[in-house]
Each structure stands twice: as structure tokens, then as C-alpha cells.
């Protein structure tokens, strides 16, 4: 009898260990999947790591002073896209609203979806780089072989010349990286699948 009780305790103990390990693995996979969107959200809220600001209106003040803005494009592993700016750099007056274009093409034989993250260097300038319109605000799905032009409308906030850390900056780099994403399902589609299971 003593052996049976001890054996039951060992089985329960082993079950707890296995359950804990499985929960840990599932949690780590979930965190890995959520890391990019969570980090992106954190950076957008805080302006950390050169993240630009999203605005609804253009600047009222345009200075004579100019800044050179260079454009960078990257694609993360697992997303079979070509992605590049149409123009590598532009000289823009501080406060002037400008539109530039990036181009993406799906090299796969199936539809693929990506989401862009972005930053500005030098990092101190990120808080002064304001986007009015950007493809990075939503995920993008491209059909096989589809090519798409993606506009970005932005301005550099005139306040950049008043701050000690940023007033001497003459060149900014706007960089995008596209990451693979599972396409979002429309709410009606998710709801109908749930109802069918019930």
C-alpha cells in the first residue's frame, strides 16, 4: 500500500512538472508571436527607438531650413517580397508636407500578408518626424506577383530646430521593415465559424 501511495504522488508530481513545462513553452511561443506588435505599440506611444509620430493634420509653419531625408527598406525572413523606396533621398524644408513612395512586390505563388514597422535615425529626431499617411498603419496583403506602390505623407516638425539634441541634425533616415503576418479575418467570418462549431 505504501508503494501505491508513493507511486501516485510521483505520477501527480510528474504531471505537474509536465503541465508547467508545456505552459511555459506555449507562453514563450505566444510571447515570440506578440513581441513585434507589442514593441511597435510601445515605441509609437513613447517615441522610443526613433519611432515617428502619427498626426492628422499638416504643419502650419514651414521654415527655410532644409533637412535631407533618406529612405531605407528591409524585408524580414519568411516574407517573399521585394521592397524598396522609389526615391532614395529627398531634401525637404522643415515643416513642409511631402509625399514619397515605396514599392513592394510579392515573389511567392500564393497571397502573402506583411506589416511594416518603422523608425527614424538619429533616434532623437523620431519625435519630430510626423506621418500624416502611411502604409505602415495597416497590414498589407499582396496577391502572387502583385506589385503595389505605397505612399508615405510626412513632415518634419519645426520644433526640431529648437531642441539642443536635434537642432544640428541635417540628415534623417526613415527605415521600414516588413514582417510576415497572418491576414486578419473579418469579424463576420470569425463569428460565423464560431456559430458553426456550436
From Swiss-Prot:
Highest taxon of the lineage: Bacteria
Residue ranges crossing the lipid bilayer per the database entry: 13-35
Compartments, record wording: Cell inner membrane
Coiled coil: none
Family matches, as InterPro entries: CtaG/Cox11_dom_sf, Cyt_c_oxidase_assmbl_CtaG
Covalent S-S links between cysteines: none
Family statement drawn from the similarity comment of this UniProt entry: Belongs to the COX11/CtaG family.
Stated name of the protein: Cytochrome c oxidase assembly protein CtaG
Organism: Sinorhizobium medicae (strain WSM419)
Gene symbol of the encoding locus: ctaG
Amino acid at each position: 500500500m505504501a508503494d501505491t501511495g508513493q507511486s501516485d504522488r510521483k505520477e501527480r508530481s510528474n504531471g505537474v512538472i509536465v503541465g508547467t513545462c508545456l505552459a511555459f513553452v506555449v507562453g514563450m511561443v505566444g510571447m515570440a508571436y506578440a513581441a513585434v506588435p507589442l514593441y511597435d505599440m510601445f515605441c509609437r506611444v513613447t517615441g522610443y527607438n526613433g519611432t515617428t509620430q502619427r498626426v492628422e493634420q499638416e504643419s502650419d509653419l514651414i521654415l527655410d531650413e532644409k533637412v535631407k531625408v533618406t529612405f531605407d527598406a528591409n524585408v524580414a525572413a519568411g516574407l517573399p517580397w521585394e521592397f524598396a523606396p522609389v526615391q532614395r533621398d529627398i531634401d525637404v524644408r522643415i515643416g513642409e508636407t511631402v509625399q514619397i513612395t515605396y514599392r513592394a512586390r510579392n515573389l511567392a505563388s500564393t497571397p502573402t500578408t506583411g506589416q511594416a514597422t518603422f523608425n527614424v535615425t538619429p533616434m532623437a529626431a523620431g519625435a519630430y518626424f510626423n506621418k500624416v499617411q502611411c502604409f505602415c498603419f495597416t497590414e498589407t496583403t499582396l496577391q502572387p506577383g502583385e506589385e503595389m506602390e505605397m505612399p508615405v505623407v510626412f513632415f518634419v516638425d519645426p520644433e526640431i530646430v529648437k531642441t539642443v539634441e536635434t537642432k544640428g541634425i541635417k540628415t534623417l533616415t526613415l527605415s521600414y521593415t516588413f514582417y510576415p503576418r497572418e491576414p486578419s479575418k473579418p469579424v463576420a467570418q470569425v463569428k460565423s465559424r464560431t456559430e458553426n462549431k456550436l
